[in-house]
Amino acid sequence: MIVTVTLNAAVDRTLTVPNFQTGHRHRASASLTSAGGKGINVARALKRLDCPVIATGLAGGRTGDRIINELATEAILNDFVRISDESRTSTALVDPTAGMLSEIYEWGPAVRPEELETLLDKLHYLSRVASYVVFSGSLPRDVADDFYAEAIRDLNRRGVQCVLDTEGEPLRVGVEAEPFLVSPNQREAESLVGQEFSEDEDFLVALDAIADLGARNVLITQETSCFGLFREERTLRRFRASIPRVEP
């Protein structure tokens, strides 16, 4: 069983607006609404791959109700902690004429200490049947930057392998907690190691640097490829993989 954790779950709304211009009134030609947040997206992908998965995290208000109902409709097993504040809504605006994407993200709900404690208790319970726990996405307001790190350390002691996909300070301190895998994108990895990448060698150096911070395995993603460092017993492997183009 894989458990995905989404602290900042959202309702994702995508609007298609051809020839969009700021300061003008437009009518969307299409709209799509779905439950979102990185951890939920991971759970959705695992479900489609027929991998046993349960999604957990924080959900509040009517937006939280909508998130949970959407997951139930998709037959994604879930067990979220209900919180008093409203979960966020994220809006993406697609202009197919210009080939442009604009995104607007809310900060997310305020979370009470007792709500976080309830989530940690739930993780302890779910870890009994979990092989992996995936922590993905940003943290809501008032949640300490070391939340992921402390949760990872606790689960490591319980023999559960943890995956971390976040950014900024939560990523930096989370890597030091020695997760099984950390998966930043290029921008997040550049921020973590303090330099920009311009050629393949920069990515390979960054893999080692991030592993030295504490991560057992590292995957740096780009739009069409990724660079990885994986340890298997006494073997250390580095690779680059290209993603094939898939027609919708």
Feature annotation, model-predicted:
Residues 129-142:
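Short acidic, glycine-rich surface-loop motifs adjacent to enzyme active sites
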Residues 145-233:
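Conserved phosphate/ATP/ADP-binding segment of small-molecule kinases
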Residues 44, 91-93, 226-230:
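Short beta-strand scaffold segments in enzyme catalytic cores
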Residues 4-7, 57, 82-83, 92-94, ...:
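Short beta-strand segments
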Residues 24, 48-130:
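Conserved N-terminal subdomain of the carbohydrate kinase-like
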Residues 1-56, 65-66, 237-246:
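Glycine-rich phosphate/adenosyl-contacting loop at the front of the ribokinase-like
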Residues 24, 32, 52, 73, ...:
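Small-residue (G/A/S/T)-rich helix-start motifs and N-terminal tracts that mark the onset
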Residues 2, 51-53, 78, 162, ...:
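Hydrophobic anchor at the start of a short beta-strand
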